Amino acid sequence: MPLPLLRKGQIMKTETTTVKSKALFSDDRTHRLLLRKEWDKNKKAAMIIMINPNTADTLNMDLTTMLVINNLNELGFGAVNIVNLYSRIMNKLSLRFNSNEDLLHPETDTVIEQYAAMSDAVIIAWGSAGNTSQRVRDRKAELLEHLAQYSNKLYKIGAHGYHPLTPIIRSGWELEPYEMEVKRNAESNKS
């Protein structure tokens, strides 16, 4: 593509960036287990865990994916591994008509654990979604058990653990350590 004409003495700098994309789908493309975007292989990689995948893939981006990439780039990251509590692709998570077997691919947690090991930071970004559903709370607890070995690199967005679409943090994130809740048995509560 030809460069625009410049007046004598003007200097113009061209910047080019390539974003590598990789996605891991089920054979029937009803589940997305991973969406990876890499724009600078020399920088840190983050993994972000949200609720469920939407329409983003290796070429198309939805608003959430765009906000994730923009904010992680500003924080100095060069790649993101996007995973979800539930791997079923849908516009909005529906627990009413779907069982956990429908919402989770059998390899979901394996993929999450593999990419948590390879990531420099693991960001819990499911926000308050599902706080009123025991099923979702159980799923969150189950996944956090798998991630306990990575507690030293678990973070949340802001003090409240926001989802990337939350208006107050869309244009700027502060990552804070994610505190793992420690389960106490009945014996330790007696004192």
Regions found by a protein language model. Name each.
Residues P2-D62, K190-S191:
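Active-site and ligand/interface coordination hotspots across diverse enzymes
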Residues L34-D40, L63-V80, V111-Q114:
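Short amphipathic alpha-helices and their capping/turn segments at secondary-structure boundaries
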Residues A45, G78-A79, A121, K153:
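Residues at the starts of beta-strands that form the adenosine-phosphate
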Residues T55, I89, G130:
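Feature marks short, surface-exposed loop/turn motifs that line or immediately flank catalytic pockets
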Residues R96-S191:
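Glycine/proline-rich loop-helix segments at beta-alpha junctions forming the active-site rim
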Residues T58, K92, S133-R135:
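Short glycine-/acidic-enriched loop or helix-start segments at secondary-structure transitions
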Residues G78-S94:
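Short connector loops at secondary-structure junctions
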